[in-house]
């Protein structure tokens, strides 16, 4: 478990944090099934994933609040980006977050525990350790507490990123640059 990981934050969907990550990584959250422990009507998973920073997921129960992201098979996960906005959400803003990973709900292990101070923008949580991507079927984000002892939470967006895999990486064949050699790389 890592406490207070290397976290950067910024706001906007076109900000430098997102642009840098999207150069070498791909958003894999679209391949997962998302669920939340509770939600106010009109503020559910759809708003968490709609690429609109004006909408948000809002919990509607006692803490801790959970967001569960389940992939159909094990995935290599590199980064988790969470968008919070203290200026707009005040006591609804999470301040203590736990990230757990595993294959099913019953074998989750906490990998990151972090505390946030008035976050405003994208929070980049790296999930690769010692140059090894996290490999998991299931991610669970738990909001353990909010700023100003707030009860319910707002999260405006969440994105999950994995490595971009090219055909060269997948097959382990080198990429040929010259036409003379490239014409012999496939069989008829």
From Swiss-Prot:
CDD domains: APC10. InterPro entries: APC10/Doc1, APC_su10/DOC_dom, Galactose-bd-like_sf. Residues 4-187 form the DOC domain. Pathway: Protein modification; protein ubiquitination. It is found in: Nucleus. GO terms for cellular component: anaphase-promoting complex. Disulfide bonds: none annotated. SMART domains: APC10 (SM01337). The keyword Cell division applies. Keywords: Cell cycle, Cell division, Mitosis, Nucleus, Ubl conjugation pathway. SUPFAM superfamilies: Galactose-binding domain-like. It comes from the Eukaryota. GO terms for biological process: anaphase-promoting complex-dependent catabolic process; cell division; protein K11-linked ubiquitination. The APC/C is composed of at least 13 subunits that stay tightly associated throughout the cell cycle: anapc1, anapc2, anapc3, anapc4, anapc5, anapc6, anapc7, anapc8, anapc10, anapc11, cdc20, cdc26 and cdh1. PANTHER family: ANAPHASE-PROMOTING COMPLEX 10, ANAPHASE-PROMOTING COMPLEX SUBUNIT 10. Belongs to the APC10 family. Component of the anaphase promoting complex/cyclosome (APC/C), a cell cycle-regulated E3 ubiquitin-protein ligase complex that controls progression through mitosis and the G1 phase of the cell cycle. This is Anaphase-promoting complex subunit 10. The lineage of its organism: Eukaryota, Amoebozoa, Evosea, Eumycetozoa, Dictyostelia. The gene is anapc10.
């Amino acid at each position: 478990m890592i406490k207070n990981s290397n976290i950067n934050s910024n706001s906007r969907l076109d900000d430098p944090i997102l642009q840098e990550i999207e150069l070498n990584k791909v958003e894999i959250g679209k391949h997962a099934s998302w669920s939340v422990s509770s939600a106010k009507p009109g503020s559910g998973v759809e708003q968490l994933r709609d690429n609109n920073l004006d909408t948000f997921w809002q919990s509607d129960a006692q803490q801790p609040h959970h967001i569960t992201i389940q992939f159909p098979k094990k995935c290599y996960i590199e980064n988790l980006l969470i968008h919070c906005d203290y200026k707009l959400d005040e006591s609804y803003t999470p301040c203590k977050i736990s990230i757990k990973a595993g294959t099913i709900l019953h074998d989750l292990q906490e990998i990151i525990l972090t505390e946030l101070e008035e976050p405003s923008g994208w929070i980049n949580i790296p999930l690769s350790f010692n140059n090894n991507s996290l490999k998991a079927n299931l991610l669970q984000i738990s909001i353990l507490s909010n700023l100003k002892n707030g009860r319910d939470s707002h999260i405006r967006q969440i994105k999950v990123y994995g490595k971009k895999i090219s055909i060269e990486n997948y097959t382990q064949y080198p990429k040929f640059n010259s036409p003379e050699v490239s014409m012999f790389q496939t069989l008829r």
